[in-house]
Amino acid sequence: MKNVTSDKRNLWMFPLGTVGRDMIYNLFTNFIFTYVLFTRHLTAAQLGAVTAIMVGARVFDALNDPVMGNIIERTRSRYGKFKPWLVIGILSTSVVVYLAFNTSLQGWSFIAFFGVIYFLYSITYTMHDISYWGMVSALSSDPHVRDSLTSRTNLFAGIGGVIASILIPMLTTGSGTLGGSTATAYGRVALVICILAPLFLCATIFGVRERRDYNTKEVPPVSFKKIWNTITGNPQILWISLVFLLQQIGNDVVMGGLGSTYVYFAFGYEGGLYSLFNTVGLAATALLMIFYPMLAKRFRRKQMMDKLMLLSVIGYAVMIVSGLALSGGMVKFWILTVGYMVANLGQYGFYLIMMISLINTVEYNEYLRGERDEAIITSLRPFFTKLASAIVVAVTSATYLIFGVTGYTNQISALERAASLGEIAEAEKLAQIDTIVSSIQPGQSRGLLLCLTVLPFVLMYASYVLYKKHYILDEDKYAEVCAELEKRRTEAK
């Protein structure tokens, strides 16, 4: 029987489907806090409430992932177990995200609305995210095909994320703001992205063929015990989960809000600058995603991690030295940005290795326990991504309070509201914001810089040490596991 997972169509249609998903994820996860910060006047209590909502919703979301994975695992339909949830999830997510960025509520009314919306997003995004990534192990067990599929999918995900990271700041902040105010601009951007996301995912829904031999097996019951036993019964899952969590916390610090706020405070309230910071910072990751399959054939994963760790050390050192030693200006900006690019290259390489290492535990689980439980295991990737983002929100909010960031953002949000109501012209708004930014103390900007460099480095190094010491599923061991599984299947026929 022909293995449909090697079908070339899958290698294009599956990755293409995630472009819009990652645009919508980038908009909500990376910019919702910035949107709230620069469009709403927040008291300390309200900032605390926003933080509590975001942390609570993301922790809930993370805990919901294995449950959703189990629900998908037992889904049986003529369309398979993954695609129905792709459709339901992406359509409901688009509606929720559009509403999130198109409200004029202020004060505690907005806080209540924000709480409802954020928890709805947590539920709806999980539906299609778990089902999408759960398909990977159903498309191929061949390590080279899986490497190609994973790296290409991350490339397309990166394309969606980079497009959003570049355009959103340019269109919502500074002189290029759509509609003359940040609030109006975010509403329009959300509309476009929420239309594009379902359209892109149609490529996966209608163009991908996955293995469906599970349809002949008994439907497993929904059981928290099963979820717990799957996770705790496989020591490699436990170790890679801890490593992945630490790496993701460090990786998300810059994109979680600290990066944009630092750029605005240190170099001016201009979205184009943060877009440049993102564009250059993420540029090298595109090359890594393209060439990762070739690198994987030449180097073992742990060898690659040595080189990636060194790159990040150099990158973070450049960021710290340039940020502390150089005076303001574009020379400082470009050196800082290049440093971020080098550091991010190492971080993203770690992410790719963590992704593949987690997926490879599916076969190891089958080897140990006789069950693949692919939807449950692959649900751990978004589980720890969301748990990491919850921790990053708490870290970001604490940093803002420590360095008095909201004292400045409240002044900016008042001007943004006045501009959206037509009370002041855009030119006057920008001039007054420039005055506010120029009053920021150097110590406040330096504090933000140290938070977005030292913390990611420390966490990355911790994940590096733990992976090297405790993860045993290297290339040889994985091949041994797959050979044993194939032998068992042959003997069972």
Q: Model features per residue range: what roles?
A:
Residues 1-493:
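Membrane-embedded alpha-helical bundles of multi-pass transporters/translocases
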